[in-house]
C-alpha cells in the first residue's frame, strides 16, 4: 500500500493515558495504536517503543513522555503516555502536554489505587476537561459482581472530584489481549475509540478564542504613538478594534490603530504571530511588560489564587533545601515576574524539592489570569518550580 499523504482535514484532539502504576497505561497505548492502525490505517507502535520514553524539557523540568498518534474515522489524535508517576505530575502541572481529555486506566484486578485518586485530583486541578475510563485486565476477573463493584468505586471517585461519575463512559477490556489480536478484546478498543470521538467535544482552537496578547515590549514612535509588541496568545486583533490593558495597574481601554509584523502593516494579527500593536492616545509610561492586551471584558486581574505546584528537585537545578510558609519567591506569568507570598495546606510545615503541593498564593500586583494559567516560580531569575492556577480567590 502506498503511503497516503497526511490529511489535515480531520479535527485534531490531544489525549493521554493516566492512572496507577502497572495498571496497563502503556500496554493500552500500544493496543490503541495497533488496533486502530488495522481498522483506520496509521502506524502501530510496540510496547517497548512507547515504554522507552525520551526525555524532554518543559520550563527547565525534565519529563519523560511518549507521544503517539492515531486516527479514528472522524478524528486525528495525539496521545501522551508517561512511564513514571512523577512524569505525570510534572506533565500535568507544566501543561507540557495539554489534554483535551484523558483515558483513566484502572486494573479490574486491583480497583482504584492511590495514584488513581491522585491523577483524578490533578486532572481536576489542572483543568483536564473530560475523563473516559478503561477498566483493564477484565480477562482476569470472572466475577461479574466484582467488575460492577470496581466500576462503582471508580464512578464514586470521579464524582468526589467533580467529574460526572455517573455519566462517564467506562469500557471493560484487556489491553494485553487486544494487543495480542484477540478479536473480542480488539472490539473493546474500537468501543473506547468511539467514546473518544463522541464524549470529548472538538476543542476550540486558539484562533477562535477571545483576543489576548501578553505585552513583551513597549516603544514610543514619534508622530505615531505607542507600540506594544508580543506574541498573540489567542484570537485575532484587527486595526480599529477596542482593547483593554489588563494587569499590574488599573484596567484601561484603548483602540488599536494599526497592527504590524516585521515593520509591515497588516489587516490583523492572529494567534501564534509576533506583532506590534499601535495604540491610540496611550503614553509610553502608562504601559509595561507583564500587562496584556485583551478583548474587553474577557479577562480580569487577580492577586490571590489556589494553585497546584511542582517543586524542582536538586538534580533539575532546583533548590537544595526545603521552603516553609511565608516563602516569598517571584511568580513568572507569561512575560514578567511578580513577587508573592504563599500559604501551605493545613498540617504541611515545609515543602521539599521534588514535591508537588497545593498552595495559596498572594501576589503584590494583580496579573491578568484565568484558571488554568501556567506560571513558573523563580528565585533571582532561576526556575525553582512550576505551577498552574487552579482556582481564583480574588
Swiss-Prot record:
All residue ranges annotated as the tr-type G domain in the record: 10-204
Residue span of region G1: 19-26
EC number(s) stated in the UniProt entry for this protein: 3.6.5.3
InterPro entries: EF-Tu_GTP-bd (IPR041709), EF-Tu_GTPase (IPR050055), EFTu-like_2 (IPR004161), EFTU_2 (IPR033720), G_TR_CS (IPR031157), P-loop_NTPase (IPR027417), Small_GTP-bd (IPR005225), T_Tr_GTP-bd_dom (IPR000795)
Primary enzyme class: hydrolase
G3, as annotated region: 81-84
Residue ranges of the region described as G2: 60-64
Catalytic activity: GTP + H2O = GDP + phosphate + H(+)
Keyword NADP applies: no
A molecular function GO annotation: translation elongation factor activity
Principal location: cytoplasm
Family: Belongs to the TRAFAC class translation factor GTPase superfamily. Classic translation factor GTPase family. EF-Tu/EF-1A subfamily.
HAMAP family in alphabetical order: EF_Tu_B (MF_00118_B)
Oligomer and partners: Monomer.
Function: GTP hydrolase that promotes the GTP-dependent binding of aminoacyl-tRNA to the A-site of ribosomes during protein biosynthesis.
Name of the protein in question: Elongation factor Tu
Species in which this protein is naturally found: Haemophilus ducreyi (strain 35000HP / ATCC 700724)
Amino acid at each position: 500500500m502506498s503511503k497516503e499523504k497526511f490529511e489535515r482535514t480531520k479535527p485534531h484532539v490531544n489525549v493521554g493515558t493516566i492512572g496507577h502504576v502497572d495498571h496497563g497505561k502503556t500496554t493500552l497505548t500500544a493496543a490503541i495504536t495497533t488496533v486502530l492502525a488495522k481498522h483506520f490505517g496509521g502506524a502501530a507502535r510496540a510496547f517497548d517503543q512507547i515504554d522507552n520514553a525520551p526525555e524532554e524539557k518543559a520550563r527547565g523540568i525534565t519529563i519523560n513522555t511518549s507521544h503517539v498518534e492515531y486516527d479514528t474515522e472522524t478524528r486525528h489524535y495525539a496521545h501522551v503516555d508517561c512511564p513514571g508517576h512523577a512524569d505525570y505530575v510534572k506533565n500535568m502541572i507544566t501543561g507540557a502536554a495539554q489534554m483535551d481529555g484523558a483515558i483513566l486506566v484502572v486494573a479490574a484486578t486491583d480497583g482504584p489505587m492511590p495514584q488513581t485518586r491522585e491523577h483524578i485530583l490533578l486532572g481536576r486541578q489542572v483543568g483536564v476537561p473530560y475523563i473516559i475510563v478503561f477498566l483493564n485486565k477484565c480477562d482476569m476477573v470472572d466475577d461479574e459482581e466484582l467488575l460492577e463493584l470496581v466500576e462503582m468505586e471508580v464512578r464514586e471517585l470521579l464524582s468526589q472530584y467533580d467529574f460526572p461519575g455517573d455519566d462517564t463512559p467506562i469500557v471493560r477490556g484487556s489491553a494485553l489481549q487486544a494487543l495480542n489480536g484477540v478479536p473480542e478484546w480488539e472490539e473493546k478498543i474500537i468501543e473506547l475509540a468511539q467514546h473518544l470521538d463522541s464524549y470529548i467535544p472538538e476543542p476550540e482552537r486558539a484562533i477562535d478564542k477571545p483576543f489576548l496578547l501578553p505585552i513583551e515590549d513597549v516603544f514610543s514612535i514619534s508622530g505615531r504613538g505607542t507600540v506594544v509588541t508580543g506574541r498573540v496568545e489567542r484570537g485575532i486583533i484587527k486595526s480599529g478594534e477596542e482593547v483593554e490593558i489588563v494587569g499590574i495597574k488599573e484596567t484601561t481601554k484603548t483602540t488599536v490603530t494599526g497592527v504590524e509584523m516585521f515593520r509591515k502593516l497588516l489587516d490583523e494579527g492572529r494567534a501564534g504571530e509576533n506583532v506590534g500593536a499601535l495604540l491610540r492616545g496611550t503614553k509610553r509610561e502608562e504601559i509595561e511588560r507583564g500587562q496584556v492586551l485583551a478583548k474587553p471584558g474577557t479577562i480580569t486581574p487577580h492577586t490571590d489564587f489556589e494553585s497546584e505546584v511542582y517543586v524542582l528537585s536538586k538534580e533539575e537545578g532546583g533548590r537544595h533545601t526545603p521552603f516553609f510558609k511565608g516563602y516569598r519567591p517571584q511568580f513568572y506569568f507569561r512575560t514578567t515576574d511578580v513577587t508573592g507570598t504563599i500559604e501551605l495546606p493545613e498540617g504541611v510545615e515545609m515543602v521539599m524539592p521534588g514535591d508537588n503541593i497545593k498552595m495559596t498564593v498572594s501576589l503584590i500586583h494583580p496579573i491578568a489570569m484565568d484558571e488554568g494559567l501556567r506560571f513558573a516560580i523563580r528565585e533571582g531569575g532561576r526556575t525553582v518550580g512550576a505551577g498552574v492556577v487552579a482556582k481564583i480567590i480574588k
